[in-house]
């Protein structure tokens, strides 16, 4: 069974004005997401599932889904604030979505096969889809608790325009994930990659340190674990009272690896990540995509 690609398209970038998922950056107005989908199809993925906000549906169908019809089957699902487990009610004042893992949970009814999860506004590169596609396609029928994450080398994921947030990964000798620690301020200073640690000190880390760019591989059992843990998350009064609390994928993954329920293999990739974190990054992304097209990595027109 071919794996599915699950695309997180419900969030709007807080730093970069407007819907960056729809920004045309390729030579024929291609979005970053177009390149991800092109790479995924070539890596053996068989279906796309997009999670979006309901009020964005018409725009999304017209501008996005129509492009891929005839190339790969597509499903559209919705992330809503009030889509909570029985017994829980969303605070009336809350406007922020419940986070990336809540978005993933929306796929439970339409995904019965191994699947990868990506952000729509990150350029992950061909090799990262190849390594994830290979991992998911090799899983035996009915596999459970055997997950993966593409580990980008931190030096390949920085922005020239400012600091970035990354999940810094700890791994063991078997390349299994042992921890993901979100660091919100990472940049290159005097040639070294540094981040601000819990004590407010700048700390150096090697260029090759694996980081999570939210490119995960799961099997469908992940949905049931998420549902149970989300109930525990919502049962904590501080998560309900904090209108900006979020149920992130690393939070869920961290729990499953710490209690020994699942393993997460960190897949190394040579791909260089890029994306538009800040408006000033846009031109650099346009130039990088053009360079890949000029080098023959991608056709000038994808679909």
What is each PLM-predicted segment?
Residues 12, 122, 154:
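Active-site metal-binding loops of divalent metal-dependent hydrolases
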Residues 59-60, 225, 252, 284:
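Phosphate- and divalent-cation-binding pockets in alpha/beta enzyme and binding domains
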Residues 126-215, 220:
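Conserved core of the sugar-phosphate nucleotidyltransferase
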